[in-house]
């Protein structure tokens, strides 16, 4: 689970919500659990059904920039749920509008926060209520860090360090 997903888990818990974290990697699901996720589900063909067995989703926030998550979200959502898309897949995304209309789903896009929301998030972080998983990488290893990011191997956020940090 990437950095945005990790923050989302924590913010949802602070808001009193039940959180079901979804990811393709077991280690990232384990991290989500330590950050407060109530349940963790492996992102595979049965994920939507598994989420329904847990009571279904009243809302889904998708940070993954891939189209493969769309059918899973539709299967996971209860009637009148809201789906928030923040990850932007390359190319077009096709789906059956019938499911959205018939079940009264709301699909929203979100790309940024405003100053007030950022200030609130920073205050939560400064108070230790929201934690980031940070991977410090020397600038000389920027290419390796980018390869790891593209391969989905990075948990949280990667921060490039300049010079000697010892």
Residues of each region from the PLM?
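Mid-domain Rossmann-like dinucleotide-binding core that forms the NAD(H)/NADP(H) cofactor-binding site
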Residues: 1-45, 50
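Helix N-cap at the beta1-alpha1 junction of Rossmann-like dinucleotide-binding domains, i.e.
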Residues: 26-27, 67, 90
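A short acidic, Gly/Pro-enriched loop at the edge of an enzyme's catalytic core
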Residues: 51-58
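N-terminal Rossmann-like NAD(P) cofactor-binding module of classical short-chain dehydrogenase/reductase
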Residues: 58-61, 84
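C-terminal hydrophobic helical "lid"/dimerization subdomain
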Residues: 71, 115-166
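Helix-to-beta-strand junctions that scaffold the AdoMet/dcAdoMet cofactor pocket
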Residues: 77-79
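Short glycine-centered segments of the SAM/dcSAM-binding site in methyltransferase folds
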Residues: 81-83, 106
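Rossmann-fold NAD(P)-binding glycine/threonine-rich loop
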Residues: 87-103, 115-123
């Amino acid at each position: 689970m990437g950095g945005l997903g990790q923050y989302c888990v924590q913010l949802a818990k602070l808001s009193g919500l039940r959180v079901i974290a979804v990811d393709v990697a077991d280690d990232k699901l384990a991290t989500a659990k330590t950050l407060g996720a109530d349940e963790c589900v492996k992102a595979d063909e049965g994920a939507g059904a598994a989420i329904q067995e847990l009571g279904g989703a009243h809302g889904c926030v998708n940070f993954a920039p891939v189209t493969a998550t769309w059918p899973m979200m539709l299967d996971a959502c209860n009637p009148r749920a809201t789906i928030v898309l923040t990850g932007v897949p390359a190319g077009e995304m096709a789906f059956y509008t019938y499911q959205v209309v018939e079940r009264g789903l709301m699909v929203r896009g979100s790309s940024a926060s405003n100053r007030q929301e950022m200030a609130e998030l920073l205050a939560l972080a400064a108070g230790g209520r929201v934690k980031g998983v940070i991977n410090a990488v020397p600038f000389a290893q920027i290419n390796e860090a980018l390869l790891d990011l593209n391969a989905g191997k990075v948990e949280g956020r990667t921060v490039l360090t300049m010079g000697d940090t010892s």
